[in-house]
Amino acid sequence: QIMARSASSDPEAPTLLFGWAGNASEDDQPSIETGGWVHCFTAPRALTLRGGRVIARPYLPGLPLAPATLEGTPGDEAGARIAELAGSRSWRLAFEASYEGALSVRIGEESGLEVVLEDGRLTVDLTGTRYPHGGRRIVTLEPGEASRVEILHDRSITEIYLGDGSRVFTTRSFLNGEGAGVSLVGAASVTNVSAARAD
């Protein structure tokens, strides 16, 4: 869900990509009732070439990642909460994962959004959210792409960067409830966790 992409370059900075999250025909989003607006900008993305392929990484110099603490482990019934993101509705999270099975990224409690990572697949299911347009989407991943994960979430937009920027998935995500905090649940080992709050 990204449209109207535009890039800018400056000799003193990386080439940046900006875009609108949402599609032109989707003007019935919940934000029209609560705030009188639809669609929003994605995070700026720094573009580079690696092996002839465009790589996109979040360009957020004002929101640097810092080491974060897991409370619990993903295999626990409640999963592993990211302590630094408790109560946050706008954040940045990065981690490395090795998979024995699926790992669910849970944003808030009972939010309706399902983000599931596996060694060769990403599943994003919006059917339980306040704006289920797009339904359930499955993306086949190249080997190793799911081992490095970075997620940006800002209230009604979620951006998932995999493989250190080789794959990017963007969706509008109007969640149920408060939609605060994040936990990791499932059969995966998670290391090198870092995070930053934007609220």
Which ranges hold each PLM region?
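Beta-rich accessory regions
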Residues: Q1-D199
